[in-house]
Amino acid sequence: MNKVKIGVVGAGIYGNYHIHTYACDPNVEKVVFCDLNDERKKAAEEKYGVKGYSTVKEMVEAEALDAVSVATSDPYHFDPCKDAIEAGVKYLLIEKPMALTVKECEELMELAEKNNVKISVDFHKRWDPAYNCIKDDIKSEDKKIIRGYMSLDDVIAVPEQWFT
């Protein structure tokens, strides 16, 4: 398996999870990131020992990246995705939602197809056993009351033991 070079867009809450997870993955050769906020950029550089850039284009071109993860706030997904595709990245992971409008999503998909870029939108609960159980219950013929409780204390980073 070839090791990959990955760039993360955004050094906020989710961006930090992405940077940390990629930095711990033995299949990742290099991790870099970009963020417009100089304080966040400096903090992430110091915390993870990885290089930070100011723009997506600069990051992708300087590092010849294979993949980019877009982990900015929801309203700011479209432009970095477009910039990454236009800068030559071949794989793009986008935190949900892909974009704010159907038109923006369609534009990204067309641009990706034109440039042979693979896109994935991260719905991190998609594989969660509890969600699959609820989905099965909803589809079930046995109609019963389904109650749910939400917790905001779950860990997002992948345990490092998973890489062995």
Language-model segments: residues:
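Hydrophobic C-terminal alpha-helix "anchor/cap" residues
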Residues: Y22-A23, M59, I138
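N-terminal Rossmann-like dinucleotide-binding module
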Residues: M1-Y48
